[in-house]
């Protein structure tokens, strides 16, 4: 896995604008991928950011009780701090099956795992807001383990 690439989004836009890729994912040939959208930004209701998501998760669990959910958080994230993730996850009231099990990668602490009924919460040690960018191996390990479970 490569080190953090600060301009990685430029590569994504170029890839998604490739005519072969657009054709493969059934996107109109005249559509153009852009990193940001003024139309989306103008339509965004900033008061939505303060709405709690717990009712959404309650509805998801009611409709699909056997669904497995993964939430991960970089423990060095200063935008969405890990404590905030913990607060809303614990407020869901799901049964805790396994608490704060350390996860190791190559003999080093990579984070901690808390398993709930239907939900796994992972911290990724040393990761910032963009876990795959700042700790790619640790993030990949979390995703691989979750998908294998």
Question: What label would you give each PLM region?
Answer:
Residues 1-149:
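Terminal and linker regions of secretory-pathway proteins
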């Amino acid at each position: 896995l490569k080190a953090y690439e600060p301009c990685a989004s430029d590569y994504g836009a170029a890839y998604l604008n490739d005519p072969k890729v657009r054709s493969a994912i059934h996107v109109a040939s005249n559509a153009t991928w852009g990193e940001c959208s003024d139309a989306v930004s103008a339509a965004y209701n900033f008061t939505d950011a303060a709405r709690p998501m717990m009712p959404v998760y309650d509805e998801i669990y009611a409709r699909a009780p056997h669904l497995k959910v993964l939430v991960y958080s970089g423990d060095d994230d200063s935008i969405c701090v890990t404590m905030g993730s913990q607060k809303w996850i614990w407020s869901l009231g799901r049964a805790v099956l396994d608490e704060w099990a350390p996860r190791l990668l190559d003999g080093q602490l990579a984070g901690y795992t808390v398993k709930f009924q239907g939900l796994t919460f992972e911290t990724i040690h040393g990761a910032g807001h963009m876990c795959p960018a700042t700790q790619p191996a640790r993030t990949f390990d979390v995703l691989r383990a979750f998908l294998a479970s």
